[in-house]
């Protein structure tokens, strides 16, 4: 299974195009354009597993830095400020990592 089994390759490409320049990544815009915001809880858990590179069950800042590359390998890395903003947007319990439930809440907010 690949990420394009869940999301359209065209939607992913369009979402990445919108944030190709550093410091232009806006999570909610990315979620909408890529189609993530329309996904069910089950589909988002599948997406979360793709993003969770080390399969630890949560995303840390190191994994978030490569968030865009999980959708397309040649995409850019998130900047430090983008990574921090993404963490702040989802880390509801302040433990420095994002669980699957927190990810789902962020995408659907």
UniProtKB/Swiss-Prot annotation:
SMART domains according to UniProt: EFh
PROSITE patterns on file: EF_HAND_1 (PS00018), EF_HAND_2 (PS50222)
Positions where N-acetylserine occurs in the chain: 2
Annotated Gene3D superfamilies: EF-hand
Tissue specificity remark: Found in tumor tissues and not detected in normal tissues.
Residue span(s) of domain EF-hand: 39-74, 78-109
Keywords associated with the record: Acetylation, Calcium, Metal-binding, Repeat
Stretch list, region Disordered: 82-109
Protein name (Swiss-Prot/TrEMBL): Oncomodulin
Annotated organism of origin: Mus musculus (Mouse)
Superkingdom of source: Eukaryota
Residues annotated to bind Ca(2+) 1: 52, 54, 56, 58, 63
Protein's job: Has some calmodulin-like activity with respect to enzyme activation and growth regulation. Binds two calcium ions.
PANTHER family: ONCOMODULIN-2-RELATED, PARVALBUMIN ALPHA
Positions of Ca(2+) 2 binding: 91, 93, 95, 97, 102
Biased composition regions of type Basic and acidic residues, renumbered to the chain: 94-109
One Pfam entry name: EF-hand_7
UniProt-listed SUPFAM superfamilies: EF-hand
Family designation: Belongs to the parvalbumin family.
Any GO molecular function: calcium ion binding
């Amino acid at each position: 299974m690949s990420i394009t089994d869940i999301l359209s390759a065209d939607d992913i490409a369009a979402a990445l195009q919108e944030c190709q320049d550093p410091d232009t990544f806006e999570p909610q815009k990315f979620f909408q354009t890529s189609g993530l915001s329309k996904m069910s809880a089950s589909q988002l858990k599948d997406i979360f597993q793709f993003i969770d590179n080390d399969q630890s069950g949560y995303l840390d800042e190191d994994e978030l830095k490569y968030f865009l590359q999980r959708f397309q390998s040649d995409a850019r890395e998130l900047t430090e400020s983008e990574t921090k903003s993404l963490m702040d947007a989802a880390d509801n319990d302040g433990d420095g990592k994002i669980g699957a439930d927190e990810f789902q809440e962020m995408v659907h907010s």
